[in-house]
Amino acid sequence: MRADIAFTKTALERIGVKPNKALGQNFCIDGKRLASCVERMTLAENVIEIGPGFGALTELLLERGVTVTAVEKDEAMVRFLNETLSHPNLAVICGDALKFRYGSVPAPFSVVGNLPYYITTPLCAAVQKALPESFYAMVQKEAADRFFAKPKEASYGPLSIVTQLYYDAAVLESFPEECFYPNPKVASVFVGMTRRPDAPDVAPAKLFAFATELLSMRRKTIRNNLKAYPNADDVLNALSVPPETRAETLAPETILALYRLLHA
């Protein structure tokens, strides 16, 4: 099993580098917890893995019989994976997951990854815009709160709205800081999301952009934030939303209804 401290240290010595803090490299060394998460995943035939590192998750995913496209930014780790984890169902791509064209992988597909903490939000947004069948991510616990945040909460934002409208989300497992090398000094959780059967027919990218616009001045009134829309007053009236309502208090379903009527 690759998710252990001995394998990780040996791999680092082999490629002659130290974990890159700038790339958010913290390697999971708790194989038991990781395997438990993978066993509970509902995966499509094609899986995109973000940041495979030394292949701890990759190995477990391949054991599930899926085809894996692994996107890794670190060239040394790409070489390591190609040398040590050759498999007919694995393609390792050297690239930036933020710039990767998720639509280039045949649908339906799932996305799995141990996400770099410093780009968790933009990376999750990029993935959700591609609307995978399922999305499983190891993230900092504080970042995970954004998926589940409710209106009026400080962490409530576009990521909360899109997650709750398009996915059924849950925490699969908690990972204390000692589950990683080097120790990140923060607790992490593995979050699982499966696409809802009643997910909106609106493109997630469009709704994400609208929610971002709406919440850019979260303490302002909804009328102020919609001043670019000439039909805003009629739409607010139709939805019985008082114009003095603050955007941060609106439920995801209300924001979806606003989008649909404003763009009708």
PLM feature spans:
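An accessory alpha-helical subdomain
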Residues: 187-195, 199-234, 239-254, 258-259
